[in-house]
Design a protein with these regions (language model features):
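Extracytoplasmic/lumenal acceptor-recognition loop(s) of multi-pass membrane glycoenzymes
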Residues: 59-81, 299, 304, 309, ...
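Contiguous transmembrane helix-bundle modules in multi-pass membrane proteins
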Residues: 147-156, 168-185, 193-234, 363-581, ...
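Transmembrane signal-anchor helices characteristic of membrane glycosylation enzymes that use polyprenol
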Residues: 11-49, 233-247, 377-380, 456-462, ...
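Short aromatic/hydrophobic helix-turn
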Residues: 129-142, 179-186, 406
Length: 874
């Protein structure tokens, strides 16, 4: 390696080290092993318990099913781990230098965007600047703080994926294929399909521009080669993730993101042909005026945290209102979203450079229009219900768009395109400094850009309420409905004044940053003018370093509002959840084998996973729960819970059975006089043996002795025609004695059965996450219903012979059992997993072959070059 090449390599190593240092400094607690305490982070802890226990007992194998939340569900979107991914996981660890969690997410984001800009032939310092402003966009830190780590990881790999595509466009087909395939594989492996899907917008527009460019220049051969390389890379990436993608796709059909089989009257206009309801898709829609947060972070108050926590706002607080505690009850955010963890802010100086790019980049440059159109589409779609006609068009006509909720998150595309176009504009500005004719034009365009961006900031700084009071319509309506007009007006006026102060402060802040950035560019201009277009390396480097420092300082300080050291805790503090006296009592009474379920009403039952630390829960939290189970929750479970609590009336207390656990006394009840089939039949068929009543201060365990158990024989079969009838029938018949069967499963268990004998039984004898064994005894044979959730892939055998599994009672499993004593085994080991794994291994081999071939061709090229130089010298 010659000195020039060695120097270049060392510079790249220095850049990588710089990125690592920046990420490490920001996440100092992570270097000590501390973990975030974000809501979704904590929610995942309960999920991991059963999965980790299974892995410990099965040589690290990941279960494809868990029983601990929502009465049981697949793990395709909880722990999407497959053996074929191990090689790429090892590659990923090398790529992020083995840095700790959180640290490497930001490091990988910076490195990925740096690779992209280098593929575009940007100077090193500009590539560093672009990498920092992309990675430090506020949204990325907000999602890390919230525990949306898959999203952060996926986003980190999108820029280098596009870098590979750019390399193909530039004729480096083999390396372009390798880079695209490698990072597309890692991107998809990040397991946030929504982010990958959204970025198809700029990617398809880029490819379209490339096609047009090739056709105009009559470079058809180049177009074909590049297209083949990109397509091959896409096939390899998809194939390597075949197991995850296939099962995610199939699973989505059965989740809340799939189309419901229920026909809901009166909601036709809210339905989509497939996917979520329109109101659910657009529940989190970015406000139109809220879009100014790209330039001014507190345009709508920032995050939904108490107003009392903002020092700037409290300077304008009313002492009388403050003493009443209202400022602790109202949030800083006043936008139209239900709530938010923070704004989408891309940086004030970045916005200046973006506007500058609109003027300095020639209109004939296709990249300019690709990035502008992508930015506009991103913003319009993020508005969601605030621009419903446009959103409806995408929901109705764009494939798969209706599968994703929280449309505001599509702003990540703008967070990508704005910095990229800004860097292109900055590059053009510096390049044109050497041209005496273009130089004055650059100055004029810089001044115009400064006036536009700075003027917007100045407008909001001096007139923060010009576009209305700083109070949301929902907030105003709520307060006016609870207070008399005078009190409501006083409160709303105070809130508006305090929030206006926050907006004013941030508007001035953005203006100052814009003026500093503009001053640096002016200085570069005057240096070039006074030196006939030439600027020394030292001056250029100094200005570049100052621009980097301004951008990093700006975005660092904003991100610290939403992601800071106080949000970390030592692992022992965060994850080591100790058993409560209630937990001890339940385990003492019913054991810890997880062969029963618990309804925990002392927490937000269907938004909390803490119950799953020690028990199989009726509730839980996961954004992609099974759709039928969600419909059962809405139609039956929520309705039955209050009735179930009423069973434990004081007159049924069994004082002789009161027991103690953990130093506390807990009541017991005699439910022999209660008809469980009419009070809470659905909860009973789910084997809900325990209810926990109370709140976070005091919990009371209530034993439900009426639960049906793990399985039972029924007396009758009720065949229905559709999902509506199936769900409604549970209001009319007792699941203890009847199996409600959709007609599509009638051939599996028949349309009638022999009534169960009093001596018939089905007993659970062994169970793991993915298997269950039963002893079934019946005099005449019959239909057995199991208190386990039905899902395609569950297979059953009777004495080793396979039998079909039917769906009963809307969500449960049922099989037909012959007379006599039999061993029933249920197993969840979907054959599709093994088939897709074979596809993944083939694609892995092809990728490794491509890497080896690219390395060989690069070695051959350099070797031939050296031979040529030696020959020329001779």
């Amino acid at each position: 390696m010659n000195k020039k090449a060695l120097k270049a390599l060392l510079m790249e190593v220095a850049v990588v080290a710089c990125f690592a240092a920046i990420a490490c400094v920001y996440f100092t607690p992570a270097l000590k092993g501390w973990r975030l305490t974000g809501e979704d982070n904590s929610a995942n802890d309960g999920l991991r318990v059963e999965i980790n226990e299974y892995r410990e007992k099965n040589g690290g194998e990941t279960p494809r099913w868990i029983n601990s939340i929502f009465s049981g569900m697949p793990t395709y979107q909880i722990a999407p781990s497959y053996d074929s991914q191990k090689t790429m996981t090892a590659v990923e660890k090398v790529y992020h230098l083995g840095l700790p969690d959180y640290v490497w997410y930001v490091f990988a984001s910076m490195l990925g965007f740096y690779i992209l800009l280098r593929a575009f032939d940007f100077r090193r310092w500009m590539s560093v600047l672009g990498a920092i402003v992309w990675a430090f966009s506020s949204y990325f830190f907000i999602i890390i703080a919230a525990g949306h780590l898959w999203k952060a990881i996926t986003l980190a790999y999108i820029p280098p994926t596009i870098a590979g595509v750019v390399m193909c466009f530039k004729g480096r087909y083999l390396w372009g294929f390798v880079v695209t395939a490698l990072f597309a594989t890692l991107q998809i492996n990040g397991n946030h399909v929504q982010m990958t899907y959204y970025f198809l917008i700029p990617e398809l527009l880029m490819f379209g521009a490339f096609v047009i460019q090739c056709i105009r220049k009559k470079k058809v051969a180049h177009l074909v080669k590049a297209t083949v390389a990109i397509a091959a890379a896409a096939v390899i990436a998809v194939g390597l993730n075949a197991s995850n993608l296939y099962h995610t796709y199939k699973y989505a059909e059965d989740t809340m993101r799939g189309k419901s089989e229920l026909v809901k009257e009166g909601k036709q206009e809210d339905q989509t042909d497939s996917g979520l309801e329109r109101s659910y898709i657009t529940q989190w829609s970015y406000g139109i005026s809220e879009t100014w947060s790209l330039l001014i972070p507190n345009i709508k108050g920032g995050a939904s945290v108490p107003l009392a926590l903002n020092a700037t706002a409290m300077k304008h607080a009313d002492p009388q209102i403050n003493s009443a505690g209202y400022y602790n009850m109202v949030g800083q955010y006043w936008g139209e979203q239900p709530g938010t963890s923070g704004p989408v802010y891309v940086g004030a100086l970045v916005c200046l450079l973006f506007v500058l790019a609109l003027f300095v980049i020639p209109n004939r440059n296709p990249w300019k229009w690709v990035l502008i159109v992508s930015t506009i589409l991103s913003i319009l779609l993020a508005w969601g219900k605030n621009f419903m006609g446009f959103t409806d068009f995408f929901i109705d006509h764009v494939p798969l768009y209706s599968k994703f909720r929280t449309v505001s998150s599509i702003l990540v595309v703008a967070e990508f395109t704005i910095p990229l176009l800004a860097m292109m504009g900055l590059k053009r500005f510096f390049e044109n400094m050497g041209d005496a004719q273009l130089r004055p034009q650059m100055l004029q365009k810089l001044m115009l850009s400064t006036v536009i961006t700075g003027g917007i900031c100045l407008f909001f700084a001096v007139a923060p309420t010009a576009m209305g009071d700083c109070v949301s319509s929902m907030e105003a309506q709520s307060i006016r409905s609870q207070l008399d007009p005078q009190s409501a007006n006083m409160l709303l006026s105070s809130f508006s004044e305090m929030r206006a102060a926050m907006l004013t402060s941030d508007a001035w802040r953005s203006l100052v940053i814009i003026l500093i950035g503009a001053a640096l560019l002016y200085f570069y201009y005057f240096t070039a003018k006074n030196n006939k277009g030439k600027v020394s390396w030292k001056t250029s480097s100094a200005i570049g370093a100052l621009i980097i420092m301004v951008c990093l300082g700006d975005m660092w300080s904003i991100n610290k509002r939403y992601m800071n050291d106080s949000m970390f805790k030592m692992p022992a503090e965060q994850t080591a959840r100790q058993k409560t006296p209630v937990d001890d009592y339940i385990i003492q009474k019913s054991g810890d084998k997880r062969d029963y379920r618990v309804f925990n009403g002392a927490v937000s039952t269907f938004n909390d996973n803490t119950t799953s630390f020690f028990f199989n829960s009726i509730g839980g939290y996961h954004p992609a729960k099974l759709r039928r189970y969600q419909e059962l929750i809405e139609t039956h479970i929520v309705e039955e819970y209050p009735k179930a609590l009423a069973m434990f009336a004081p007159e049924r207390a069994d004082t002789a059975a009161i027991q103690q656990a953990g130093g506390q006394m807990f009541p017991a009840y005699d439910l022999s006089s209660v008809d469980g089939d009419t009070v809470c039949p659905v909860l009973n068929m789910l084997n809900t043996r325990w209810f926990i009543y109370g709140d976070d201060q005091r919990q009371i365990p209530l034993e439900n002795t009426l639960a049906y158990g793990n399985a039972w024989f029924v007396d009758n079969i009720k065949v229905v025609d559709n999902a509506n009838q199936e769900l409604d029938a549970l209001h009319q018949v007792s699941p203890r004695h009847n199996a409600v069967i959709d007609k599509q499963f009638a051939q599996v268990v028949g349309d009638k059965c022999e009534p169960a004998d009093s001596a018939d039984y089905v007993k659970l004898t062994a169970q793991t996450s993915t298997t269950a064994e039963y002893e079934a005894v019946s005099k005449k044979g019959g239909v057995a219903v199991f208190s386990e959730i039905y899902y395609p892939g569950w297979e059953a055998t009777i004495d080793g012979q396979p039998v079909e599994v039917a769906r009963a009672n809307y969500v449960l499993r049922a099989i037909k059992v012959p007379a006599g004593k039999h061993k029933v085994t249920m197993t969840f080991d979907p054959p599709t997993v093994h088939k897709t794994e074979k596809v993944a291994y083939v694609c892995l081999a092809l990728l490794l072959l491509g890497v080896a071939l690219a390395a060989f061709m690069e070695w051959k090229r350099k070797n031939n070059k050296e031979k040529t130089l030696v020959a020329d010298a001779a």
